[in-house]
A protein has these predicted regions:
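Residue-level recognition of specific faces of alpha-helices
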Residues: 6, 31-34, 76
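Short basic helix-loop element that most often maps to the first helix and adjoining turn
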Residues: 7-20, 81-83
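DNA major-groove recognition helix of helix-turn-helix/homeodomain DNA-binding modules
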Residues: 25, 46-63
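Recognition helix of helix-turn-helix/homeodomain-like DNA-binding domains
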Residues: 27-44
Length: 86
């Protein structure tokens, strides 16, 4: 679903800290810290994980999975483009 490095990269793209992401997602800061400390796919309470992913997507982040069409292979994140944008 999402990896710890993807979460950190998504926050960096948005210019927000862990506290802000926790507030957007409605979870605790320690929850965000535990998720981001994961070296691979984040594991944990599915409800909390879903809240974080949805908060990042609402904020404009697109999560790139292993099978996503991309110029490079592997997981990543990018900002969504506005409708009618490049």
């Amino acid at each position: 679903m999402i990896t710890g490095p993807q979460m950190r990269a998504a926050r960096a793209l948005l210019g927000i800290d862990q506290r802000a992401l926790a507030a957007l997602a409605g979870v605790s800061v320690p929850t965000i810290q535990r998720m981001e400390a994961s070296p691979g796919t984040v594991r944990g309470v599915i409800g909390s994980l879903t809240k974080v992913v949805e908060a990042l997507e609402r904020a404009g982040v697109e999560l790139i999975g292993d099978e996503a069409i991309s110029q490079a292979s592997g997981r990543g994140v990018r900002l969504k483009t506005a409708p009618g944008g490049p």
